[in-house]
Amino acid sequence: SVMGTGRSNHCMDLMGNAEQLGVDAAVTWLGTQDWSNGRVAMIGKSYDGSTPWQAATFGNEHLATIVPISGLIGVMELMWKNGSSEARAPIMHNGVYGSYGIDGDSEDIGNMCPDYIIGPGTGVAAWMWGGEAAGTYWKERYFLDRVLANYQGSVYLIQGMHDWNVDPHMAIPVINQLKDAGIESKGLFGQWDHDYP
């Protein structure tokens, strides 16, 4: 789970800098423990499948491999393709993901952060104007460029070609971009939807 979900607390900023730094800190902690061999792997599906991409953006020496299963290479890329938005684009990101940190208990206030307020506005603005209207909200949540520039580990990319949620463009041509950048990459692609193979 990510910050603000499960039994964790703190601000869940919906794949923003705080979450990315938290994931990187977890990799460093795991890689530096006495019982660790110093090599960390990350796996996850859907939102949790995006956290391995986040970790890989830092080039952390302890991150040996990532296994994103239907994970996002970027948040805006989930709902916009070739300049066109899906119908869910203006509300999906914060309407669905934003609800993860809110469960009606006394910790809700501590789990909220400024990006909860900024997010819905950026979703609507991007839907209206086709991109980043102000600030760096979407750029901060795009991972692939930093992975290609910084990551030194390997990638095992898993994606269903019938995935209606995280579309296959998050895997193809991404696997080719990874290989072109010299990142050891393998893929498992098949005829399933937003699920495990």
Where are each of the predicted segments found?
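Cap/lid segment of the alpha/beta-hydrolase catalytic domain
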Residues: 1-31
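Alpha/beta-hydrolase fold nucleophile elbow
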Residues: 34-47
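Short beta-strand immediately N-terminal to the catalytic nucleophile in serine-hydrolase-like folds
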Residues: 42-44, 69, 158
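Glycine-rich nucleophile elbow surrounding the catalytic serine of serine-hydrolase chemistry
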Residues: 44-54, 165
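Accessory cap/linker subdomain of secreted extracellular hydrolases
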Residues: 54-150
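Short beta-strand/loop motif that positions the catalytic acidic residue
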Residues: 151, 157-159, 163
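Conserved alpha/beta-hydrolase "acid-adjacent" motif
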Residues: 164-172
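Catalytic histidine neighborhood in serine/cysteine hydrolases
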Residues: 178-196
